[in-house]
Amino acid sequence: MEKKTIIDLFESSVKRFPGNPFLWEKTGKRFEPTTYSKVRDLVYEEGAGLVSLGVRKGDNMALLSEGRNAWIIGELAMFYAGATNVPLSIKLEEANDLLFRLVHADVKYIMVSGQQLKKIRAIKDKLPAVRKIIVLDELAEYQDREMPLSEIRRMGKVYLGIHPLEEFLAIGQSLGNDDYATITYPSGTTADPKGVILTHRNYTANVEQALTCVDIDDTWRTLVILPLDHCFAHVVGFYIFMSKGASVATVQVGRTGMETLKNIPVNIKEFKPDLILSVPALAKNFKKNIEQGIRARGKNAVRLFNLALRIGYIYNGDSDEEEGKGFRILLKPLVRLFDKLLFAKVRENFGGELKFFIGGGALLDKDLQKFYYALGIPMYQGYGLSEATPIISTNGPRRHVFGSSGVLVRPLDLKICDMDGNVLPPGEKGEIVIRGENVMAGYWKNPASTADTVKEGWLYTGDMGYMRDGLLYVLGRFKSLLIGSDGEKYSPEGIEEALVEHSSCIDQLILYNNQSPYTTALLVPNKERLRKHLAHQNLDLTSDQGREEAIRIIQRQIDRFRKGGDLSSMFPDRWLPTTFAILPEPFTEQNGMVNSTMKIVRGKVEKAYAARIAQLYTPEGKNPQNKWNKEAL
């Protein structure tokens, strides 16, 4: 079998595109490029420094940093030294979360940014196996076992001055397809997350697979706005672009995490990317900002914008096969006019060169997809998971259908199975099971979970879906299906998305039914919107009358989905919440209720609010006008 490691991929691109800009970074007033050949020089220097430090083939190194050139160069340098990267999320705030990963992964060396160093220092005494902590930024002083990256580079120069280059390169070239590249810990899956082992060939295979769905050329640029520890950001964010000689930028690092987030829209506009990776939470924020900008122009602008959207929705239909076809062709002049008057100006806020978004992390609401498509910057939904490196399918310029997760990457085998593992015919819903070179090597030091998840080369994803007309439709977690008292199973995610999307006074919501007499919901209200509604009736949330009316407002918004409501055709009544619990605080990363992609961690929410769920199945709790809901408001 031909050897195709990440090092091979990188060396091939440097050879073909030496003068192309590879990495872009903004530390001052503008983004500055570093070419492929220059990045290679820096990688050699740093990799040789790691070897000089004592890093050996098979050692595990952790990387904890904001997105920046040093992150990508650092990972490549690890590979040239023969090491495996354990990328860590900067959103890990709890010392125990970091400590578990570092100890569980047998980490010997840590690369860390100056901003994140305090987290390592807080647990350093509990990490006796860690030999050195390499700080990516220059500090006034360093503590025990700490050293600056500049010293590693100095050591690398000395090493390369003494040893033949071929001797150093032989270390990286000794890596094979099955050697480990990363051990990633997807957040929010269990109390002690599993370490997903991805090999060099897992990554290069998924790059090849993804390029069967999306075309990229060497002039393209992307700004990676997702955390680099995600394998989604790894594959689509820089390895696909690297394979094509294209350019990768990272968001300007602020003094705080919030400042870095605020830099995202500014950086997008100035860097002018061709493609951006997104997750639903970011997509919703972008949409919210666009709508706020339109409202700021006055009521006439809002009416015109909404009219333009409606016409765009009709013209585009639900897929590329419907777009502009049949009677829709009559709308083309209007679509072009509105695009010139309105949507082109919106696109300028994304730099003016953006071709499309690729969405991952969680399912994108269908209405959200239609919104961006009407603007002329499609947000194509893809599907994958860390254990598949991660891409399994995606919509794209070649083919898209709103609501689907697109066509399968190639080559890849997929089957849909029932709960007993029997293969189901096309169109029937069951667990998505895949086989291909992108399937992980296993879970680190967890053979039992590996055996449960990968069977004879087939990865059991734990997600529910079906195939239709060559497209994959993902319905949600197979293992988080709600089960009615009659044994009927249904996926909650689509219902939850719709309830939040169409209910202005509900910010977050999860459904619950575990063979219970009826479905219930735990929800986080939008108190600001409730106050505005109440103000029209001279009420507020401080009075009993105001709180009772607020609960009625939420109930009415849910009732829109019931028989007689304007959204009644979307879901069966029995799947909708009979009653609901209003929660006193939102689901956040800080309280552990959402993961780093802003996806609600159902198990943690259910555990934290077990008593509240039990109350919903009492006579008092079944009535939404209960004391607990009033207290929460």
List PLM regions with ranges.
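Conserved AMP-binding/adenylate-forming core of the ANL superfamily
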Residues: F22-R68, L76, E93-L99, P148-R153, ...
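Conserved pre-ATP/AMP-binding loop-to-beta segment of ANL
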Residues: G19-P21, E151-Y185, D192, D215-R221
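Conserved C-terminal "lid"/linker of ANL adenylate-forming enzymes
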Residues: Q508-Y512, P517, R560-L633
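Structural core segment of the AMP-binding/adenylate-forming
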Residues: L53, Y80-G156, D559
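Conserved AMP-binding A3 loop
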Residues: P33-S37, A181-V207
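Conserved ATP-binding/catalytic segment of the ANL
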Residues: N422-G427, E431-G484, Q625-A632
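ANL superfamily adenylate-forming
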Residues: K118-G176, I290-F343
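Conserved AMP-binding/adenylation subdomain of ANL enzymes
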Residues: T204-R221, L228-F343
